[in-house]
C-alpha cells in the first residue's frame, strides 16, 4: 500500500502526559527528517491506551498547531478508554463489587498506575483535564472540540454477553459506552467523518483466545482503504 508505518511504545502510560507527548513528538520529528514525508500526511491511532494517547495528541496538534510538527489527517482508536475520569470510577466500581477476581486484579493494577502519577482524578480535575482525551462530564473539559473537523474512527467488538460471562460486567464497564458519547458529540458538531465502527465477535488474541479487546476487531482491508482515502 506504500504507506510508511511507525510504531511507538508508550509503556504503561494510560494518557498523553508531558513526557509521552515529548517522546512522541521526537519520534515524529525523526520521521519527518529521515523519510522526508510531508507534515500533513499523518494518520495517528492506537489500541487500548495507545488510542487515548493518539486521540489526545491529535487534539493538541489542532489546539496548538504552532507547537506541534504535524497536521494530522485523521485519528483512530481500537477499543480505547478515553475518559480518565470515567475510567477511574469504573475501576473503583469493579474493585468494590468484587464480581470477578480477574476484573478486580485488572482494576487494582490500573488504579495504581493512575494514582502514582497525579492522584485520584476527581480530586485533581485541573491536571487530568489536560491529560484526558475526553470527559463525559462537560464541566471537567471539552477537549473533543479540537476534533470537530477531524476524521475520527473508533473500533469496537460489541459483545455484551462476553462481558457478562467473562468479567461479570455490563455495558457500563465498557470502553464503547464512553466512545459512543464522543462520536455523538462530534456528529452534533457537524462532523460527518466521525464514525463508530461496530463489529460482533471479531476479537481474538494472537493465540486464538476469544477476547473483544483485541487488534483483530479492525477490518484491515477496509481500514487501509479508509486511510488511503484520507491521504489522497
Placement of each model-derived feature along the sequence:
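Short, solvent-exposed loop/turn and secondary-structure capping segments
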Residues: 17-20, 56, 86-90, 165-167, ...
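Mobile cap/lid helix-loop segments that gate and shape the active-site cleft of serine hydrolases
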Residues: 88-145
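Conserved alpha/beta-hydrolase
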Residues: 1-15
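Primarily recognizes the serine-hydrolase "nucleophile elbow" in alpha/beta-hydrolase
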Residues: 33-34, 39-98
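Solvent-exposed loop/turn segments at secondary-structure junctions
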Residues: 11-15, 48-52, 80-85, 135, ...
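Short, proline-enriched alpha-helix->beta-strand connector loops that line the catalytic pocket
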Residues: 71, 145-153
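Alpha/beta-hydrolase active-site loop
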Residues: 15-36, 56
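C-terminal catalytic histidine-bearing segment of alpha/beta-hydrolase fold enzymes
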Residues: 152-162, 174-232
Amino acid at each position: 500500500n506504500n504507506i510508511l508505518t511507525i510504531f511507538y511504545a508508550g509503556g504503561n502510560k494510560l494518557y498523553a502526559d508531558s513526557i509521552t507527548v515529548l517522546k512522541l513528538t521526537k519520534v515524529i520529528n525523526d520521521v519527518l527528517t529521515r523519510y522526508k514525508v510531508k507534515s500533513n500526511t499523518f494518520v495517528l491511532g492506537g489500541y487500548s491506551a495507545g488510542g487515548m494517547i493518539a486521540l489526545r495528541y491529535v487534539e493538541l496538534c489542532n489546539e496548538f498547531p504552532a507547537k506541534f510538527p504535524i497536521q494530522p489527517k485523521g485519528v483512530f482508536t481500537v477499543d480505547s478508554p478515553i475518559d480518565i475520569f470515567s475510567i477511574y470510577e469504573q475501576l473503583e466500581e469493579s474493585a468494590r463489587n468484587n464480581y470477578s477476581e480477574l476484573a478486580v486484579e485488572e482494576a487494582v493494577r490500573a488504579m495504581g498506575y493512575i494514582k502514582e502519577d497525579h492522584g485520584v482524578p476527581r480530586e485533581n480535575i485541573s491536571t487530568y483535564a489536560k491529560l484526558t482525551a475526553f470527559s463525559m462530564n462537560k464541566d471537567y473539559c471539552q477537549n473533543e472540540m479540537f476534533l470537530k473537523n477531524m476524521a475520527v474512527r473508533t473500533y469496537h467488538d460489541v459483545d455484551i454477553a462476553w462481558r457478562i460471562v467473562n468479567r461479570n460486567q455490563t455495558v457500563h464497564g465498557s470502553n464503547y459506552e464512553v466512545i459512543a458519547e464522543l462520536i455523538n458529540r462530534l456528529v452534533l458538531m457537524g462532523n460527518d467523518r466521525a464514525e463508530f465502527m461496530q463489529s460482533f465477535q471479531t476479537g481474538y488474541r494472537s493465540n486464538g483466545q476469544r477476547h473483544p479487546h483485541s487488534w483483530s476487531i479492525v477490518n484491515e482491508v477496509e481500514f487501509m482503504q479508509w486511510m488511503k482515502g484520507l491521504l489522497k
